[in-house]
């Protein structure tokens, strides 16, 4: 049986988390704590390593701790029975760097699908209440993780739509 799981994550200056390391069991893990201590930010940082971007924040400067000029997330995963180290770093005002086993990706889309993940939050009521656009985006994100052809065609399609809308 092929299994994917996270062994460990080290988070530095990610939102309200200044410097923490978390070690996980390969079965079930529970995050427990008072409101505002960073439980959701831990989940978002894991999502960030799996997808290459935050689930909750579109802009990189929103995820860097306000007291610092950079953020770093480092995760040790087991993917398809192989050890994988994923690192994401951002300097304030700079570009995001995403690395797999110490090698930087040229395109973020090359990373998508290595560590499939789905995150659903209380903010996702729009999947049910709003129109089909939000549902389509959600389904596209899931399919794209498992089908590179679909991902590449979706990227091309979105570029065509953007170009058309500029006319």
Question: What name fits each language-model region?
Answer:
Residues 48-51, 166:
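Regular, well-ordered alpha-helical segments
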Residues 51-126, 132-134, 146, 150:
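Nucleotide-state sensing region of NTPase/ATPase domains
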Residues 27, 45-46, 114-116, 138:
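ABC transporter nucleotide-binding domains
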Residues 1-48:
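Pre-Walker A-like glycine/lysine-rich segment at the N-terminus of P-loop NTPase domains
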Residues 28, 121, 142-143:
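Short, histidine-centered active-site or binding-site loop motifs used for metal coordination
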Residues 126-167:
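An accessory alpha-helical subdomain
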């Amino acid at each position: 049986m092929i299994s994917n799981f996270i062994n460990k994550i080290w988070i530095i200056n990610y939102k309200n988390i200044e410097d923490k390391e978390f070690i996980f069991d390969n079965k079930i893990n529970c995050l427990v704590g008072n409101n505002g201590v960073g439980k959701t930010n831990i989940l978002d940082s894991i999502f960030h390593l799996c997808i290459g971007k935050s689930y909750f924040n579109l802009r990189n400067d929103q995820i860097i701790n306000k007291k610092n000029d950079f953020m770093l997330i480092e995760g040790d995963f087991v993917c398809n029975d192989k050890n994988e180290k994923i690192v994401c770093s951002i300097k304030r005002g700079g570009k995001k760097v995403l690395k797999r086993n110490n090698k930087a990706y040229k395109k973020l889309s090359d990373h998508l699908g290595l560590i499939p993940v789905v995150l659903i939050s209380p903010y996702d009521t729009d999947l049910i209440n709003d129109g089909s656009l939000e549902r389509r985006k959600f389904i596209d994100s899931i399919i794209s993780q498992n089908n590179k052809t679909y991902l590449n065609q979706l990227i091309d399609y979105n570029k065509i739509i953007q170009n058309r809308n500029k006319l």
